[in-house]
A protein has these predicted regions:
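Structural recognition of the beta-strand scaffold that forms the well-ordered cores
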Residues: 33-36, 58-61, 80-83, 138, ...
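N-terminal secretory signal peptides that target proteins for export/translocation
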Residues: 1-5
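Loop/turn elements at helix/coil->beta-strand transitions in domains of secreted/extracellular proteins
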Residues: 53-55, 77-80, 175-180, 236-239, ...
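Early extracytoplasmic/lumenal segment of secretory-pathway proteins
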Residues: 26-95, 231
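Sec-dependent N-terminal signal peptides of Gram-positive bacterial secreted proteins and lipoproteins
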Residues: 6-27
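Mature extracytoplasmic/periplasmic domains
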Residues: 280-359, 363-371, 376-377
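Extracytoplasmic ligand-binding site segments that recognize negatively charged/polar headgroups
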Residues: 85-87, 91-237, 251
Length: 395
């Protein structure tokens, strides 16, 4: 028979272990694992969500949709939310990596509140992905363009007069000494060469890959990069580069916040008619462990005021009409004004400049416009894994 004292010790240890396991379980239940792009969320909003729901949000970063896919497919980490672009949502769905969204848990979501461009992108996605609306919630959207140094004499004229692409790849059309950068994501790089040839980036064959490779090998780029390209142009180390329009705007906002007047900004962006249009979306992986918390986070981020505040930091355009209207009409979130838009930090012209930027670079289509957004949405239709491998190896 066990000694009573020893028995009590055993019971105490068992109780202690149970408590530790219970606490650990609670902690795990309150941690949201988010896979996101770099510099792509308002961190003040994340902290606010953590406080409101007594949880923690752990953010991992990947630099491309392809990395998103490999991380979700591997299942090494059970992410609760991911923010891939349209074509990658389709691929993840086709591979059985996503679970449907429970829209009954998203009272802040109203499909009628989507901007015309966002609606059109979903409609285009549905041509090859019928269940798109059931698996994604729009996060941010935009285009790609050619950011350039306004102080480089003759550069702006050359870009505009040649619809961007001819000047971008034929450097004889550029002012002497122009330093050009290329966005280092194979799918996007391939698309630029197809736009240059007036071909669709969604057609991939051995012949088009050969054409793309020939163009790239015959074009001298001073730098290949991603997020750093915008900073290189702003600092004068590059003159021209292909990038997200949102990256350009992010750098613009930084300059404005640092006290530079809008008319004194040294760079601008040209958005060709034939370019990439995209929409990044909140999706829930099939292996997510904190599905209810993921829905709470989605609902929190798409709230009108929060979508507005998120767009103010990352530079990309909100897909929600009500939030967009707040921006272009200079409205503020009154109770959060001092937290997010301290006048001493941002300057008195911040809201006016933000409104100008949205209307200039993300203009709403007119009711009579047949095309609701500028650009081409990338698709996975007719593109095999071997094609994607060839594109990757080409770069």
């Amino acid at each position: 028979m066990l000694d009573k004292k020893f028995f009590k010790i055993i019971c105490f240890i068992a109780l202690l272990l149970t408590s530790v396991i219970s606490l650990s379980s609670c902690a795990n239940n309150n941690q949201l694992l988010l896979l996101n792009w770099g510099e792509y969320i308002n961190e003040d909003l994340v902290r606010e969500f953590e406080e409101e729901y007594n949880c923690s949000v752990s953010i991992s970063v990947a630099e491309s949709n392809e990395l998103f896919y490999s991380k979700i497919k591997s299942g090494t980490t059970a992410y609760d939310l991911v923010i891939p672009s349209d074509y990658m949502v389709e691929k993840m769905y086709n591979k059985g990596l996503l679970q449907p969204i429970d829209f009954s848990k998203l009272p802040n979501y109203d499909e009628n509140n989507l901007l015309p461009g966002a609606k059109a992108i979903i409609e285009q996605l549905e041509l090859t992905f019928e269940d798109a609306r059931s698996y994604l919630v729009p996060y941010l959207w935009g285009t790609f363009g050619l950011m350039y140094n306004k102080n480089k004499e003759g550069l702006e004229e050359s870009i505009v007069n040649n619809n961007g692409w001819a000047a971008y790849f034929n450097h004889d059309l550029l002012p002497s000494g122009t330093k050009v950068g290329m966005y280092n994501v194979p799918r996007f790089t391939y698309a630029t060469t197809m736009f240059y040839q007036n071909m669709s980036p969604n057609i991939v064959t051995k012949d088009t890959i050969a054409i793309s490779k020939r163009i790239l090998t015959s074009t001298k780029f001073s730098q290949w990069g991603t997020d750093q390209l915008k900073k290189q142009i702003a600092s004068g180390n590059l003159d021209l580069a292909y990038m997200y329009t949102g990256d350009f705007l992010d750098q613009l906002y930084i300059e404005l916040q640092n006290g530079t007047k809008l008319e004194d900004i040294s760079f601008d962006i040209y958005i060709p008619d034939n370019t990439i249009a995209f929409m990044d979306n909140l999706v829930i992986p099939k292996k997510a462990r904190h599905v209810d918390l993921a829905h709470k986070f989605i609902n929190f981020m798409i709230k009108k005021e929060n979508a507005y505040l998120n767009s103010s930091v990352v530079g990309y355009c909100t897909p929600y009409q009500a939030s967009y209207d707040m921006i272009v009409n200079w409205q503020t979130v009154d109770e959060k004004w001092k937290l997010y838009f301290n006048e001493e930090e941002y300057g008195s012209d911040w809201l006016k400049n933000w409104s100008y930027a949205m209307q200039t670079y993300y203009p709403l289509p007119k009711a009579s416009d047949k095309v609701k957004f500028k650009g081409t949405v990338l698709s996975n239709k007719n593109i095999t894994n071997d094609d994607l491998t060839d594109i990757t190896n080409m770069v």
